[in-house]
C-alpha cells in the first residue's frame, strides 16, 4: 500500500498543474454510482445464486431488472458534474469500475465489464446487457442470438475477476513500458469514490507512487464517511459532504 502524504497539496498548485499539463486519468469507483440510491444493495443468497442464474437466464433478467439497473443508476447531478469535469479540455481517460458506462466524449475503460459479459452459448458472440435489457422490456423470456442460441450471463457478468485484457488496458492508459523502462502517460490521477481495497486500484497507486515526481499528482474525492479509506488525503479538498459536491468544487476551481 502506498504511503500517506503528510504534506497537504495546495489547491493552487493542483489547479495550475491541471491547466498546464491538460491530462488526467479519472478512476470512478462504486461510491459514485451508489450515492443516494435507496435500493437494497444485497439480495438473499436464494435470489442471487450465480450458478442458478447462469443456468436459468430468466432468473438473471429478473434480478437484473429489479436490482442491478436500479442500484447502478447514476444520479443526474453526479453524472453532470463528472461529464463537466471531462469537458475541461483535459486529455482524459476514464476507468469506470461500475456496471454501466454513461460517460461521453472520452475513452472509457470498464474493468468490471459487467455490461459486456453476456454471450451466446452456441456461437459465443458477446452482448451488452444494457442493450438486452431494453429489448427485453421486462418480459420473462429467453433472448435468442441470430444463430439461434440462447443468450446467457457468464461468470464475469458478476464481477468475480478482471480479465487480463482489461488489466492491460488500464495499465496502458497510465503507464508505458519501453526497453524495460516504465514511464507515466499522465500527470494526474483523480480517484472519485473508489474502493482502495480493490487489488487493481492498489496496484495502480503503488506503481504510480513509485514513478511519480514533483510534476505528478494524485487527487482523491471521497465522502467524509469514507475518509479512513483514503490513502492520499487532502483535508482542504478531498473531504466533502458528498462526491458530487467534490467534483463540482473541482470544476468551479478549474473554471476560475
Model-derived segments and their meaning:
Residues 1-256:
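Conserved catalytic alpha/beta core of Sir2/sirtuin-type deacylases, generalized to analogous enzyme cores
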